[in-house]
């Protein structure tokens, strides 16, 4: 979780930012995994923003042991467009897997009671989340809670590879997908 400066232009759910935690290392792109206003403010009144960073490469693997609470970071952005509003004429089906769920978490936070806007283009959604092992998935509990409380509704189907539940075009079609 990062505190944002007053100069932050604001972001939309699912955008990304370039973040630099160390001046010796260049900035890296990370998805913003929180909706505007979803995390509130810190004691100094600064808006908060969440990044979800999976330790996949040489750089991200070292972050957990190198970063410290209160450490300054440089955040540039936001960038990109990941719009979950869609069209009233078409049902939305969201498919995500692993850390690729982070932009969807931000979209789901924007659909929570108190944060949800009265945007007429927001439609109910079918969401499919693919995970290697649901029992060990660090994001699944949060995802389930957000989907259960979303306005309008988001129906979540979890595809747990550890239990042989893989998402295929045939599975998607059988579940009422496009």
Where are each of the predicted segments found?
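Histidine-anchored nucleotide/phosphate-binding helix
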Residues: 101-118
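Conserved hydrophobic helix-helix packing surfaces used for dimerization/oligomerization
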Residues: 92-93, 125
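A short, basic/flexible loop-to-alpha-helix module at the beginning of a structural domain
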Residues: 78-88
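Ferredoxin-reductase
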Residues: 1-74, 92, 130-133, 144
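Short, glycine-rich nucleotide/cofactor-binding loops
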Residues: 93-102
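Short, flexible hinge/linker loops that cap or flank conserved catalytic cores
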Residues: 43, 85-87, 119-121
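Reductase modules of NAD(P)H-dependent flavoproteins
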Residues: 51, 58-67, 71, 118, ...
């Amino acid at each position: 979780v990062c505190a944002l400066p007053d100069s932050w232009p604001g972001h939309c759910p699912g955008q990304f930012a370039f973040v630099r935690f160390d001046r010796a290392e260049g900035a890296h792109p990370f998805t913003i995994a929180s909706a505007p206003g979803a995390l509130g403010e810190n004691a100094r009144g600064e808006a908060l923003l969440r990044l979800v960073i999976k330790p996949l490469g040489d750089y991200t693997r070292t972050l957990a042991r190198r970063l410290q609470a209160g450490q300054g970071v440089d955040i540039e952005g936001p960038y990109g467009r990941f719009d979950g509003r869609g069209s009233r004429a078409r049902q939305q089906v969201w498919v995500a897997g692993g850390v690729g769920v982070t932009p969807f978490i931000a979209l789901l936070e924007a659909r929570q009671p108190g944060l949800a806007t009265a945007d007429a283009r927001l439609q109910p959604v079918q969401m499919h989340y693919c995970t290697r092992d649901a029992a060990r998935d660090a994001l699944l509990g949060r995802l389930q809670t957000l989907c259960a409380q979303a306005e309008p509704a988001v129906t979540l189907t979890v595809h747990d590879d550890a239990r042989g539940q893989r998402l295929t075009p045939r599975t998607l079609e059988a579940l009422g997908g496009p």
